[in-house]
Amino acid sequence: MNISSFSDNLTKILGKYEDLSEKLSSGIGGEEFVKASKEYADLEDIVQKIKEYNKAKAELEEANNFKQEPSLDKATLEMIEEEIRNLEDSLPTLERSVKIALLPKDEADSKSAIIEIRAGTGGEEAALFAAKLFNMYQRYAELKGWRFEILSIDETGIGGYKEVSASIKGKDVFSKLKFESGVHRVQRVPETESQGRIHTSAATVAVLPEVEDVDIKLEEKDLRIDTYRASGAGGQHVNTTDSAVRITHIPTGITVALQDEKSQHKNKAKALKILRARIYEEERRKKDQERANNRREQIGSGDRSERIRTYNFPQGRVSDHRINLTLYKIDEVINGQLDEFIEALIANDEAKKLSDI
């Protein structure tokens, strides 16, 4: 983005903000008022940043002009030069802040999320690690004040999870958790290991935006719904009614099966929630792929087959391979203190997008 178009963009945004302010003051009502109010609120953050940036630019210009005054004494000149240095130091940060606010918004960022964790390579140890990851995200959600609801769970005999999913409700949940998608690897000595050897296992995390019926319309004709008796470990039937539900979205082939609840109705409702999220995410993935192909390069690092993070318990470290960040605080991270990683990943994503402008 060249200087001229950047400046023009800022002027247009400020003009639109003023127009909306006048519109809201004119006594409009109904849907027009609701729409204008939302637009006005959406612009408040960027307008505040633009005003701070413009103020610093104006002060710098004023200080440079004042510096040219021939009648200035030495002390005043030194004071002005210090002010100029401070303003010149602050301008790049303020400009970057404005540019970040101008970046296209991911429409899913404000949504709640569904998180799915599956044990990968490593047998029982992988299932135990999947359970530990699940507890880590549950604790993170608690620290953020988000609502955490288990949707489905497939347990092993000793406390591990073959597969588990949950709904995490709150403001901007997806924007915080979307970079957690991928393969998480653990290196540790299993409790069952008598020789003290370090084992490596893995679990896959998928984070999907939670969508409502208004976002993804599911037509009845596009769904195949099968019901069957729920089964427990070893395949034995655990009840006598067809409470388990399998829903297939025929156009995409995406299937969700749930049997956690005793009620068929509850299993169906949860399955539809997960199905909507998976269809929505598949549509987002296709759009991202199209944009990437248009630029002839892959966008970001959200490939779920990619190893993104390693948790090394003997060394007490957690390493995120996408941003080369290693923290020697594994206990804190496993207990839900993820902000240091999440904030660094968001900053890295913003930097990539800024480089494309």
UniProtKB/Swiss-Prot annotation:
In terms of SMART domains, this protein maps to: PCRF
**Keywords of this entry:** Cytoplasm, Methylation, Protein biosynthesis
Q: What is its main location?
A: cytoplasm
Q: Where is this region: Disordered?
A: 283-313
Record's GO cellular component, any one?
cytoplasm
Q: Where is the composition biased (Basic and acidic residues)?
A: 283-309
| Superkingdom per UniProt | Bacteria
Give a single Pfam family match. RF-1
Q: Protein biosynthesis as a keyword?
A: yes
Physiological role? Peptide chain release factor 1 directs the termination of translation in response to the peptide chain termination codons UAG and UAA.
PANTHER family (alphabetical): LD18447P
Protein known as: Peptide chain release factor 1
Origin species: Rickettsia bellii (strain OSU 85-389)
Gene symbol here is prfA
